Curated annotation (Swiss-Prot):
PANTHER family: PROTEIN TIC 214, PROTEIN TIC 214-RELATED. Part of the Tic complex. The keyword Transmembrane applies. Belongs to the TIC214 family. It comes from the Eukaryota. Residues 256-299, 1613-1636 are annotated as: Disordered. Involved in protein precursor import into chloroplasts. May be part of an intermediate translocation complex acting as a protein-conducting channel at the inner envelope. This is Protein TIC 214. Coiled coil: none annotated. The gene is TIC214. GO terms for cellular component: chloroplast inner membrane.
Amino acid sequence: MMILKSFIPGNLISLYMTIINSVVMVGLYYGFLTTLSIGPSYIFLLRARFMEEGEEGTEKRVSATTGFIAGQLMMFISIYYVPLHLALGKPHTITVLALPYLLFHFFWNNHKDFFDHRRPTRNSMRNLSIQCVFLNNLIIQLFNHFILPSSMLARLVNIYMFRCNNNMLFVTSSFVGWLIGHILLMKWVGLVLVWIQQNNLIRSNVLIRSNKYLVSEFRNSMARIFSILLFITCVYYLGRIPSPILTKKLKGISEPEEVGESEEERNIEIETISEGGGANQKQGTEENTSSSLFSEEEVDPSKETEKLRVTGKKKKKIKGEFHFRFKETYYKNRPVYETSYLDGNQESSKLEILKKKEDKYLLWIEKPLVTLLFDSKRWNRPLRYIKNDRVENAIKNEMSQYFFYTCQSDGKEKISFTYPPSLATFGEMIQKKIYFFTPEKWFSDELYTDWSFINELKRRNLSKEFIKRVESLDKESFDLGILEKRTRFSNNETKREYLPKLYDPFLHGPYRGRIKKWGSPLSINQTYKKKNTDPFWINKIHALLLTTDYHDLEQTLDTLNIKSLATEKELSLLTLTEDEQGNIDSEDRVKILKFLFNIVITNPNNQTIRKKSIGIKEISKKVPRWSYKLIDDLEQQEGENEENVTAEHEIRSRKSKRVVIFTNNQANADTYTNTKDANDPDQTDEVALIRYSQQSDFRRDIIKGSMRAQRRKTITWELFQANVHSPLFLDRVDKPLFFSFDISGPLKRISRNWICKNKESKISDYTEKKIEKKDEAKREKYKREEKMRIEIAEAWDSLLLAQVIRGSVLITQSILRKYIILPSLIIVKNIARMLLFQFPEWSEDLTDWNREMHVKCTYNGVQLSETEFPKNWLTDGIQIKILFPFCLKPWHRFKLQPSHKDPMKKKKGQKNDFCFLTVWGMETELPFGSPRKRRSFFEPIFKELKKKIKKWKTKCFIALTILKEKTKLFRKASKETKKWITQSILFLKGIIKELSKINPIPFFGLREPYELGETKKDSIISNKMIHKSSLQIQSMAWTNYSLTEKKIKDLTKRTNTIKNQIQKILIIKDKKNEFLTQEINSSSNKISYQDKILESSKKFWQIVKRRNIRLIRKFYFFINFFIEKIYMDILLYIINIPRTNTQLFLESTKKMIENFIHNNEANQERINKTTKNTTHFISTIKTSLSSLSNISIRNKNEKAFCDLSSLSQAYVFYKLSQTQVISFYKFKPILQYHGTSLFLKNEIKDYFEERGVSHSRLRHHYGLRQKIVWHSGMNEWKNWLRSRYQYDLVQNRWLKLGPGQWRNRVNQHYLAQNKHLTKWDSDEKERLIHYEKKNDFQANSLLTQEYKLNQEQKYKKSNFKKHYGYDFLSYKSINYQDKRDPYAYGSPFQVNKREESSYHYNMDKQNFFDTLRDIPIHNYLGEGDILDAMGNFSHRKFFNWRILDFCLRNKVDIESWVDTSTKSKKNIKTVVKNYQIIDKMDLFYFTIYQDQESNPSNKKGSHFDWMGLNEEILSHPIPNLELWFFPEFVLLYNAYKVKPWIIPIKLLLFNFNGNRNINQNIIENKKRDSLIAPNEKQIIGLENRNQEEKEPIGEGGLVSDAQKQGNFKSVLSNQEKDVEEDYDKSDKKKRRKKKQYKSNTEAELDFFLKRYLRFQLRWDDSLNQRIINNIKVYCLLLRLINPNEIVISSIQRGEMNLDILMIQKDLTLRELMKKGILIIDPVRLSVKNDGQFILYQTISILLVHKNKHQINQRYQEKNYIDKNHFYEFIARHQKMTENKDKNHYDLFVPENILSPNHRRELRIRISFNSRDKNGMHRNAVFLNNVKNCGQVLTKNKHLDSDKKKLIKLKFFLWPNYRLEDLACMNRYWFNTNNGSRFSMIRIRMYPRLKIR
């Protein structure tokens, strides 16, 4: 029965999974995979298989296989056997052994004869060869992983070792798997060999038959073949290892020992303490080395964990405070004996002297041959040189950052891959030294039980505290004191003396600033020097490590005084006075000593306890550093500029060239001459740019001498590779043909080309397509030429000495052209003119020749002058530009140009005004371009000859044409005469016939000739008719004339043949009847029956012939007309269908709208009712639909205050109600969800209630809104959601973090500031309807009270509100039911309380130009917005102006969107805000102020009318930058808007504003006081007050030149003071003299460079050539003495544009940025911020930089009150008592009562113990003790009626908390604060939450 049960499918699957996941199966699998990694070690094995035969061959094969398996087994064993692993893992050892062995092996194979004559016996030689085969296979297997590295498959076993618990079983099974795979491989090779030997086809080959001994020769040469293969593989693999002798030797700054000594002197304070307690300190040279927090060095934050207080190799033994001594401690392989502890300064100084002598003596002894060959500190491998400005040399990352060690996690022992190595070493050291200390080994179950017990204990304590706080809340004791306050670090509980916020480790975020650098180390040491050291100190680390019992540990920690655990004064965290140092009582001291020495027993031979007092020293470690200080090219140039002796750069940076664009060679005659300091080395006479090569950067900051092929992330996998590719993107690279197996791609390309060709053939008649194709062909040609130019330029760059050769050749060509070739051509031309009896043109030619200028340019094309050469032109390259190039003309013609032509336009003849000289002496348009075709000298001559020949030909042709016409007339006349003669003859014949009929001849044979004559007449007439008709048809020139003519001719021929046949038949018949008798004459006057048939058939053929001719002639036109008629009918029908439907639809909608308006007017009383938060949605529909349906505007002054934001909801439901057939069941889940009731109007609810869709409780809750104080969290959450700028993260990051409804929250409402809405309506009776809102006065008074709150209350409430908002958000995120939640799509349906939100009637005009940037789209998606008019963009998170595809025909629409007129706007008010806050999310769209005062009344149409507001606004936001030519800056700017706390650069860039703006704004506000309501006056006053407060903080005015420098320094002192101060002090250039600035501009530029800003000149494609030409022409004009001629010609050619040329001499940075010339971007320097700051930047969403926090502090309250409803839900009793505190007590997450640290701890501990499936034990106490959770949370009980949701809340961790928890766990539990390691764990960041 049990056997049958095992065959159940479920049991089979589980059995199968168990077998598959077992260690044995995994080991077999990995071992089998390692077989596939066939490396060079297989060469010997296959050699024995191929070559050896007979008995000896069998033995050799066995020995080869045995050696191979033994070698592999040794490799497997070495994984766990440490000595073997160290022996095989040392690269020096393996290399030294491998090189002689390989040499011996090749010598053995090639010189066998040398050994043959010496062999004593055959058997001994045979045994030796067999042993050699065994050794070969064994040793080469050991080399495989080091000298001959195999693939990754061979290392899979090593990787899986650390995941496997049963290690030996895994190793054994993997070896067995490898053995099985090896046996299979060998069998397969044997089968292949047998198949080759037995195959007849191979034997029957012609080549093999021709040579019978080919196989035997091949077998004999097999040894040589295998030797060659082995040699090739060895060379290939060894080539990847740098040669020990040939590698580049770097010049170190000093020997490693000297470096250690300097580091010791600089960073370490060696302190030896005498017996009497006096301290003899050796002071450092520069830095204070005390480990105090206040003197912390500014070390790179990424290396914070490796921060050094270290010595070199001569560092002393770290002193411990325990009195036991180690017998011998090895430090850096040097023994430090116990005598060094017993004596004072004398012994320690002797020890140092002894060690110095020892080091010098052992210098040569410790450097064996291997060390000389292999310098471990040489840059052989392509490692990154990580610079650190704070430390002299770079940190050496020799090994991986991962350290595997066992640690306890979740109560179980697990391997941690990031265990602190120092801690592991320390633990092992203690275990080795304390050999008698054997702690009890706990089993895993005991560990887990103990851990669970402790965890449960702590969780209960937290839960109890939490429940007590909730119970107090339940008793309605609303007090902020209930909330757990923030933990602070204090040294005295009674006095409450806290550590400053800056240094408090419990605080984080904006409070954690930068640790400031203190003064000289002497003063600090004097401050911290301790006069009387305490007699005894306890090491806290030892007390914790050596205590195993938890309860004993608690008792121990209780007995230890907290102050006793502090370190010495130099190491203490707090600056405690001497009086505050507490001493331990004698009894406590004895207890502690007994406790410690019961565990830690010192050397039994020495039981004396030392009475000396020893200070605690910090445990530190030595971080390996490179002994070489390497510099790059930039640092080398800086050193040269500073006139310091600098070494050659060792870091290969990207190829670049310094392009000098301006050199100041003129005498300084300006105002700056006096201030110029002749001794100042920093005075720059050049302006240069760095031009980088367009080649792919193969260097990547590699160090000289290192192997480029060994780089990790950039591989070279082709023989010739143009670009560097990362292996990560190898699948996206275009592979060569032999790598690509994809056939679909070429097929698609062929089919696409074929379809395009067919289409082009169809539309080839259209000229537009032809033009487009021509333009495209031109663009493609231009791209090809540009690519070719770049390739040529890069080729000249890459070749050795190419620039020298090219520059010399160019100079030679220039001289040859100017002074030899062109003068000789002029001489030859004029001599030829004289020989041809023409006047010579010496003066004209010489004038043109003198006009040609050869300007020397830089390699990039920047012009210098004729005589000036660029700097380093031989190495950097040169270009020669020819201005007004001379072109030899056969003659000169003087023609005056017409004056009406525009001289600015380029003419075709002026294209050749400049060119560049090539190496071959040719001319080209652009540098390195293809040579252009020069104007030919003989071309005008040939043209003149052609013209004369043409004239002569025309005269001849005229004579010939006249002669031809005469001959044609003569022919025509002869034809007409001939025709007249023939017609007259026929007429005469007819007369004769008539006469013969009247007078017949009376004899018998005359009757038949008469009939015959009649037949001939008919035939003649018919022939005549046919001829005429054919002539008529022939005269008409139709399209298909040839076809018609051919058919007519065929018919004519056919009828003629029929006639001829009839005539022949008649003639024969006449001949037969010629001799008839006289009897027949009696019936001679009668026509016979046959004649009648003949006559009728004749007529019939004539009719058929005529009809056929007519039909053939008209058939083609009939078909065309018929087709066109069909097309026209179809087209008209298609056009009429939508027109009629549209007309019917418009008429029906008009009727519906009129009925709707009529019904609305009937319900006017219902509209006028005053509600607290709602507006009737029908009036909104009427307004919007009336404007949409273009009803005539009858009264423009009628106004109504309503909320257009409800348009979207109302319009949708209105359309739904109009639908006759609607499936309401689809709306049931939306409408029955309890959250929807908060956002629906009453009318909509009633409508759906009648249809049974929504619940009746919706109306019930809605009806309570006016009766109770509404505390609904849903609306608060929604309004809060709109106001939080923290959740506008970087777009791609936010989409990963937020839940579904957050991804769809893009339809935020835009702001509107005009106070009245002109409502257009069709009814004249409508009047102004004022909605008197109850909350207006309250909100305004709240605004007034808000600024009266002191700073502490503000901070508390903002903090509280912040946590409240986050918890609300997390609660709602748990409870969302559908990703497409209806209210996530909706607009804000609430009416603004304090400010009636209203809009201009032309709604499509408002935000069009604001949307032309990457601004968060939810701020610009109102219902009347331009985006809705142009399409549905609501699914997009961010909006880009490139999406809008404008056509030319839409230009009128665009103009209609923007109202540029200033008429009828007198009554519109404008609130001028100094910082125009457009965004709701507290993001600043910074404002650049106008420098001059503008009078709007005189500038009609100068401002765009956004919402009709901008008549008086003097400031406009910056965001139109993207329409300029700096796209990078706009992207960075938008990213900075979203996260403004990264670098507070806004004070630096945008606030250099004049003070006059404030006065101007205040004056304008006074003018408008009469138009503004009292509450609005308060807002404006507050804004002005804010501006006045802000002015001394951040805005130093650049008003006059005299004040600029002084104000500039004050601005620098105030802006970014905290951020930049320390970094400036530690700048490398801090030892320089202070500059005496010549001008304010130079001071500003130096300021930006000091702040490490990157500024660049960037041009787009549209402005590329324009700006380049202007820069080049400006640089040329600066050098010329008389530049007038060049200026005029440049303007005529269009090279120089006067608009770009700025006439102002001194331009401030703000003006440069405003004009779009300069962009400034702060360089992201990681060394500027400490690790905490970077960590909280990347992880914490809550925290904002303190500068941002201070700036936004004024605007937060105002913006919240003006634009949000967050503070509008105020309790009624608070309104009555004029208490304006916000009500934040509706806590949706009860855990908010706890502090963030305890909240995190509680959640983590709950998740640790979540073993119970029902999950209710966690909340049972909470639910029993608290009366009603819903009352605590909110007054809407239905929000928390579902218990499952509350349980789900407990399991939910909001992503913000999750990120924090993850970071904290990584940092503290696993010692991972590195970003790369942090990303490894990010995969498991969001495990699926189970509903328990």
